[in-house]
Every structure is written in structure tokens, then in C-alpha cells.
Swiss-Prot record:
GO terms for molecular function: protein-glutamine glutaminase activity. Deamidates 'Gln-593' and 'Gln-594' of the chemoreceptor McpA. In addition, deamidates other chemoreceptors, including McpB and McpC. CheD-mediated MCP (methyl-accepting chemotaxis proteins) deamidation is required for productive communication of the conformational signals of the chemoreceptors to the CheA kinase. CheD is absolutely required for a behavioral response mediated by McpC but is not required for the response to asparagine mediated by McpB. CheD is necessary for the generation of wild-type prestimulus CheA autophosphorylation levels. Also required for methylation of MCPs by CheR. GO terms for biological process: chemotaxis. Gene3D superfamilies: 3.30.1330.200. This is Chemoreceptor glutamine deamidase CheD. InterPro entries: CheD-like_sf (IPR038592), Chemorcpt_Glu_NH3ase_CheD (IPR005659), Cytotoxic_necrot_fac-like_cat (IPR011324). Keywords: Chemotaxis, Hydrolase. HAMAP family: CheD (MF_01440). Disruption phenotype: Cells exhibit poorly methylated receptors, are tumbly and have a decreased sensitivity to attractants. The gene is cheD. Belongs to the CheD family. Its EC number is 3.5.1.44. It catalyses: L-glutaminyl-[protein] + H2O = L-glutamyl-[protein] + NH4(+).
Length: 166
């Protein structure tokens, strides 16, 4: 009889990966970036994407990293989850990050990357009719998040506020 040991799947910046129970999925370094988890509770499967920027139209490279931008990352994560056996109608979302790590004297909204990332992700989730179950966004602290596909709990660690689960 073989037993498989749970693995923590690490998601880098501008990266997306899928995890199935018993594994968990984690990303760190969420400042203005947003960690978006899409999951199918019944399938005990989740995708985590580490979004850096709100809009891919500003990309100056020919080869687009679809995980990097909110407007392409949501679709990419959905596609990966469906390929992994999840059902689009069953997908739910949790998100964390989108901090304003540095305060600028400018009133220019272009400098507010964190809030713009959160807004862009919410717009995409709305387009796909995916409900946001919970979020921990904004503020001025960086975050590390880890999601458990079986319990659907998102554990959040910050330096200033400590730990919480949503």
C-alpha cells in the first residue's frame, strides 16, 4: 500500500499552477501583486495565479506571459482548471494582496498598481460569473498565502498583522 505525502506547490511571481488534495499551493511576495485562487470544492482542486499587473495591453514583448496580467490570468487559470477536471460553474474565488507598498505624492492612479490589480481581477471574475467568497486586499503589508484544496481555506501571513485564515 502506497501513501503519498502532501506537497506544497510553490507559485512564483507572474506564475500559475494547479494543486489537488492532499497537496497545498503557496505564493509569497504579494505586495502590489495579487494572489488569486480559483477552486472547485467538490473536485478538491485549485489554481493559484500570482498577478503582477492589471493590463496586458501595456506589454512591450511579443511573447506574452498570460499569468502576469489580470486581464489574461483569470482566463488562463480557468482553462487550466477545466483541463484538470474542474467544472466552470462550480468555480469560486479567494484573493489576497493588492497593497500600496509605497505612498506616492502623485494623485496619478497609474501609480496605484495594487488597487488597480484588485479591480482588474474583480472585473474579470464578474465577466466569468465567478463569485468571490473572501478577500484580504489593500493595506500596506506584503503577504504570503497558502491554499488547502480540501478545506478551501486560504491562510495569509503578513509581517505586521500576523496570520489569518479566510
Amino acid at each position: 500500500m502506497s501513501t503519498t505525502e502532501a506537497v506544497v506547490i510553490k507559485v512564483g511571481i507572474a506564475d500559475v499552477k494547479i494543486a489537488r488534495f492532499p497537496d497545498t499551493i503557496r505564493t509569497s511576495g504579494l505586495g502590489s501583486c495579487v494572489g488569486l485562487v480559483l477552486y472547485d470544492k467538490e473536485k478538491q482542486t485549485a489554481g493559484l495565479v500570482h498577478v503582477m499587473l492589471p493590463d496586458s495591453t501595456l506589454s512591450k514583448t511579443a511573447e506574452l506571459n498570460r499569468a502576469k496580467y489580470a486581464d489574461t490570468a483569470v482566463q488562463t487559470t480557468i482553462d487550466m482548471l477545466i483541463e484538470a477536471g474542474c467544472r466552470k460553474f462550480a468555480l469560486k474565488a479567494k484573493l489576497a494582496g493588492g497593497s500600496e507598498m509605497f505612498k506616492f505624492k502623485s494623485t496619478n492612479d497609474l501609480m496605484k498598481i495594487g488597487p488597480r490589480n484588485v479591480l482588474a481581477i474583480k472585473e474579470q471574475l464578474s465577466l466569468f460569473n465567478i463569485p468571490i467568497i473572501s478577500e484580504d486586499t489593500g493595506g500596506s503589508s506584503g503577504r504570503t498565502i497558502e491554499f488547502e484544496p480540501k478545506s478551501c481555506m486560504l491562510h495569509i501571513r503578513t509581517v505586521k498583522q500576523g496570520e489569518k485564515t479566510i
